[in-house]
A protein has these predicted regions:
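Contiguous mixed-secondary-structure segments that line small-molecule binding/active-site clefts
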Residues: 2-3, 59, 90, 100-202
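Extracytoplasmic small-molecule ligand-binding "clamshell" domains
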Residues: 71-89
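Short, polar/charged alpha-helical segment
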Residues: 47-72, 190
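Immediate post-signal peptide segment of exported/extracytoplasmic ligand-binding proteins
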Residues: 25-42, 63-70, 170-181
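Short, Asp-centered acidic motifs that coordinate Mg2+ and/or phosphate
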Residues: 95-96
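N-terminal export signals
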Residues: 11-31
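Extracytoplasmic "Venus flytrap"
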Residues: 39-56, 76-80
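N-terminal secretory signal peptides
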Residues: 1-7, 20-22
């Protein structure tokens, strides 16, 4: 990132709670000379639809600023692994990130409240409303601070609860989950682990 006389930066994490998009970018404290360049990374592969969302966002920002702000969005793994994005943005290794808040579940499990969880509780639009009008944004800032997250999160792009899954054998009773290899994230990790599933928390 090109900077002139910017001794201190604060990184913003633009996150997609309950959704699939978290974007991070630093706020510049003083005036810049020339275009500002930012390097972001997503938690998604290059061909993933959610990575395309991040690219679309960056293009809109670039166009709106008339080229004064140039955001480059890299795919997952280009600089850090998907689950290393929060730390990379906090430390300034990257200027921004696009992912899902639930991916930080291992650092602070309460962050899963903003993720698409099991099939009960608030839906995605309810979570966004709670975040904006019900104190969710303030709670999120405290949770990030509790794990040393030097980021500011912006939520967008609601996603409904993830489908249960696609299985080789029919699931007809709860005991069928015992020993079953199952991919999920957020609060669903604890739920299906308690049911005996072998859960993988993959991006």
């Amino acid at each position: 990132m090109t900077e002139a006389k910017t001794p201190r930066r604060r990184n913003l994490l633009k996150g997609a709670a309950v959704a699939a998009g978290a974007i991070s970018a630093p706020m510049i404290a003083k005036a810049q000379t020339g275009p500002i360049s930012m390097r972001w990374q997503s938690t998604w592969p290059a061909k993933d639809i959610f990575h395309e969302y991040a690219l679309d966002y960056a293009k809109k920002v670039n166009d709106m600023t008339g080229g004064d702000l140039k955001i480059e969005v890299l795919p997952a793994g280009a600089v850090v692994p998907a689950f290393g994005l929060l730390e990379a943005v906090s430390k300034g290794t990257l200027d921004g990130g696009h992912g899902v808040l639930g991916y930080h579940y291992g650092k602070q499990n309460a962050l899963a409240l903003w993720n698409s969880g099991p099939a009960f509780g608030m839906d995605a639009n309810m979570i966004l409303a709670w975040h904006k009008y019900g104190g969710g944004a303030e709670l999120l800032a405290k949770l990030y601070a509790s794990i040393g997250g030097n980021v500011q999160s912006f939520l967008y792009g609601p996603m409904s609860t993830q489908p249960l899954g696609w299985f080789k054998k029919p699931i007809t009773k709860s005991s069928d989950f015992k020993g079953l290899k199952f991919r999920t994230n957020g609060l669903a990790i604890d739920l299906f682990t308690a049911m005996g599933a072998a859960v993988n928390a993959l991006p």
